[in-house]
């Protein structure tokens, strides 16, 4: 008899019910629990999958390049990037009638196409790509690279090429290689590409495979580098009237610190970005030589973490930052969940920072004027950030349950956090309650007085502290005259600002009023930022409580023996349902989605006003609840509701359909979240009974006995539907409402 799925668990493979499939899906990624898994084997398998992961990413990027080169309008778009819509790919759909074909024939194509809202056209244009041939070459190169990585993944699973456990556990050499190689050298390579290819292309000089070895990126060559006269590379930058992609107004500088934006493209100066990547490369290559390896020189991380020396030589401290870190080296180095938790937290934070910086300081030429792309990229990165952060806390909780050793960590920061968890959790609870009641109280008060026809009775609070911070960065609108908004202040006159390096470009940008840098803020912003604070603190409260109580609580001291996810400990211990670390993750996901919803609503509505030249609507309507419901959500769903109407369809119809479909998926989630096992078991048994007694239908038999989902599984299915529906609904709303206004 053939082995049944799943191969990784003989126990499950022999289960006669449909549990087999569901539990296999649930434990598929829980490699530690698989049959015959050793620690060494686990590390080797995870290592090999990294190659596969990178190969898939290259394959995906290759497909973007290929489809745009084949079916897109890259060469036409370059000629007029502000007015021509970039095409992602063609649409072949046998259901399309004449109206649909006409509606989706857009962007200068003569067949139905999808418009691209990812910003890849702007990126390729900025980094020096100019022809479809460039795109095809990139696609083929990435395809070859993907094959190399797939082979490398396979190779590292062969007995002779499997790294040993000690290799995986040598933290210092890995850190050196990742810092110097992964970050340092790749940043250096990117700086090289910008200097040798992108900057010349932006000045109308083509650099290709045929001439890149013979074309000097700077007229002085390497002489200034070797003679220490580095300032030459910064002199003669592009002028304010430079036309991107031509030599008109172009300079010769390759490494600058101009600050602000290129006036025509409204993106950061390419020469500033090359300088930035070169600086990053230098820092990280130095950092990659700091840690002790076989040569016995450099820092030992274990010694640093265990050290009790003070900052001043001869003094003592409790440890790094005056906090006890002893025992952390082995705890971290021997727990994949600890490592994954920290990496996800770091990556989640960075992803949110990317969302903020991509619109405030756009790096790609003309992307600032592609409003739908700006909205899509901000929303995309903020959504990814919340999921990464949720994962960080989830794996942190699994670490507490599976990997934490109280003896090894006695008296260090982990031990301390566990010992005063009540204080941490109650403070988070207090601040969430405070923010919730006060923020909602203000919104509800304002809502009521507006409804009663006395809007002048609203409680409106100016965000004076935030305005002070904006002013100190150079925003003069508020008249606060502090730091960079005061030409006589020390911030303004200190070197290198006074040396006219970057300050003028920055001040022009922050005070321009047409970009998204330090937006003008008022009472509506004050209120919504307190709503964000409420949502973030509540999400963190649920996650932190779930992680810190994962090993045990007063109610259930032996919780860690039940693992990361368990439904209840039976009727004998009443009240032990819904308190596993998994349940905290489950509840926190709803709050995280709530948070990212409010954040993206705010960002989008605020920007719609700026882009349409009507900031008054946001300022006036955002201070009360009905303003948000009516003037943001309802008013902007008009395009979606009109996707199909009695007169036929238009190119927003696909988003109208997705909007409806998203609601359907979202609503399906409640079926799993609200009705529980007994209902489903009875329903399944009734359906099976009917099936087995229906002619023809009863010729087909399900081999496994149908069993309802467990409570935890039904929650997971419900949560997944809720999340996917939420994402699809807002994505359709965002793109249709923005594209409907700006094309």
UniProtKB/Swiss-Prot annotation:
Q: What is this protein called?
A: Photosystem I P700 chlorophyll a apoprotein A2
Q: How does it assemble?
A: The PsaA/B heterodimer binds the P700 chlorophyll special pair and subsequent electron acceptors. PSI consists of a core antenna complex that captures photons, and an electron transfer chain that converts photonic excitation into a charge separation. The cyanobacterial PSI reaction center is composed of one copy each of PsaA,B,C,D,E,F,I,J,K,L,M and X, and forms trimeric complexes.
Gene transcribed to yield this protein: psaB
* EC code: 1.97.1.12
Alphabetical keyword list? 4Fe-4S, Chlorophyll, Chromophore, Electron transport, Iron, Iron-sulfur, Magnesium, Membrane, Metal-binding, Oxidoreductase, Photosynthesis, Photosystem I, Thylakoid, Transmembrane, Transmembrane helix, Transport
Annotated chlorophyll a B1 binding sites = 663
What's the chief localization of this chain? membrane
- Specify which residues bind phylloquinone according to the UniProt entry for this protein: 680
> Which PANTHER family does the record cross-reference, listed alphabetically?
OUTER MEMBRANE PROTEIN, OMPA-RELATED, PHOTOSYSTEM I P700 CHLOROPHYLL A APOPROTEIN A1-RELATED
GO cellular component: a single term: plasma membrane-derived thylakoid membrane
Transmembrane domains' residue ranges: 46-69, 135-158, 175-199, 273-291, 336-359, 375-401, 423-445, 526-544, 584-605, 652-674, 716-736
Q: Tell me, which GO biological process terms does this entry list?
A: photosynthesis
Regarding protein family, the annotation reads:
Belongs to the PsaA/PsaB family.
- Superkingdom of this protein's organism: Bacteria
What is its biological role?
A: PsaA and PsaB bind P700, the primary electron donor of photosystem I (PSI), as well as the electron acceptors A0, A1 and FX. PSI is a plastocyanin/cytochrome c6-ferredoxin oxidoreductase, converting photonic excitation into a charge separation, which transfers an electron from the donor P700 chlorophyll pair to the spectroscopically characterized acceptors A0, A1, FX, FA and FB in turn. Oxidized P700 is reduced on the lumenal side of the thylakoid membrane by plastocyanin or cytochrome c6.
The reply on keyword 4Fe-4S is: yes
Catalytic reaction(s) noted: reduced [plastocyanin] + hnu + oxidized [2Fe-2S]-[ferredoxin] = oxidized [plastocyanin] + reduced [2Fe-2S]-[ferredoxin]
Q: Which residues bind chlorophyll a B3?
A: 671, 679
State the organism named in the record.
Mastigocladus laminosus
